[in-house]
Amino acid sequence: MTIKNEEQQQQTNKLKYPKNLLSSGLDGEGNTYINIEDLWKKELEGKDNKMEDKWYKSADEYWKGVEATVDGMLGGLAQVSPIDVVASKVFIQDFIKGTDSRPPINLNLALDCGAGIGRVAKEFLLPIGFKNVDLVEQNKLFLDKAKSDNFKDDNRVENYYAVGLQDFTFEKKYDCIWIQWVIGHLHDLDFIEFLKKCMDSLTPNGIICIKDNCAKKRFIMDKEDNSVSRTEDHLKYLFDQAGCKLLKSMVQPNFPKELFPVLMFALERK
């Protein structure tokens, strides 16, 4: 484990969470955490950062057991994919067309984060007009599936980065960095650091878009895939800590009622 990660672990526990984020949370087994600080203390603190290693390894092991299909990527809910894509297209239109206060983004290169088998790139990012897309996904088998199936005869995907977001090193500038259903696998400080790296890797007028589950009243820890669903206020706090300006937010419509609410956020540097 690097010195940087040692420092990050210390800082994670020193985030000054506002009082409204210090309510209790739950895991999928019904266990209660006193607050978000208690979650990170139990999940991350340990000698030589071994607990932080375990945090990411547990998620990695979970996804190694998931089928490399759309149904696998969406937890057995492949039927929501078209609904998801339609809403994402609506959400990003203001940024593609531009507004009185903001010129349109360029459509040269997008980054699909937590890309899986490339569903978002294939069904959304490329169809809306991006000339090229890079994929970053920790599971190499998913990327191999993307290469052999989704993009077999499509050279618009330039790079396939097999690495977790917490370890990803940006090599390019992007017009749009799209981060969907993956931030729950990053602990708070790594999420903040990743957003900072994203901002440093945007082209002029580029945007970061986040689409993910939002817990309604308090955070929920999923012990099965080792991820945390944060409240909207929690996410906005982390955006602020990273130095991000919120440009737009939108609730995903028409999803099954039994699912977590899904929100979309567009960000730029403050």
From Swiss-Prot:
Disulfide bonds: none annotated. Gene3D superfamilies: Vaccinia Virus protein VP39 (3.40.50.150). One of its GO terms (cellular component) is cytoplasm. GO terms for molecular function: methyltransferase activity; N-terminal protein N-methyltransferase activity. Keywords: Methyltransferase, S-adenosyl-L-methionine, Transferase. It catalyses: N-terminal L-alanyl-L-prolyl-L-lysyl-[protein] + 3 S-adenosyl-L-methionine = N-terminal N,N,N-trimethyl-L-alanyl-L-prolyl-L-lysyl-[protein] + 3 S-adenosyl-L-homocysteine + 3 H(+); N-terminal L-seryl-L-prolyl-L-lysyl-[protein] + 3 S-adenosyl-L-methionine = N-terminal N,N,N-trimethyl-L-seryl-L-prolyl-L-lysyl-[protein] + 3 S-adenosyl-L-homocysteine + 3 H(+); N-terminal L-prolyl-L-prolyl-L-lysyl-[protein] + 2 S-adenosyl-L-methionine = N-terminal N,N-dimethyl-L-prolyl-L-prolyl-L-lysyl-[protein] + 2 S-adenosyl-L-homocysteine + 2 H(+). S-adenosyl-L-methionine binds at residues 114, 119, 137-139, 165-166, 180. It comes from the Eukaryota. The keyword Transferase applies. Coiled coil: none annotated. It is an enzyme of class 2 (transferase). InterPro entries: MeTrfase_NTM1 (IPR008576), SAM-dependent_MTases_sf (IPR029063). It holds the Pfam family Methyltransf_PK. Alpha-N-methyltransferase that methylates the N-terminus of target proteins containing the N-terminal motif [Ala/Pro/Ser]-Pro-Lys when the initiator Met is cleaved. Specifically catalyzes mono-, di- or tri-methylation of exposed alpha-amino group of Ala or Ser residue in the [Ala/Ser]-Pro-Lys motif and mono- or di-methylation of Pro in the Pro-Pro-Lys motif. This is Alpha N-terminal protein methyltransferase 1.
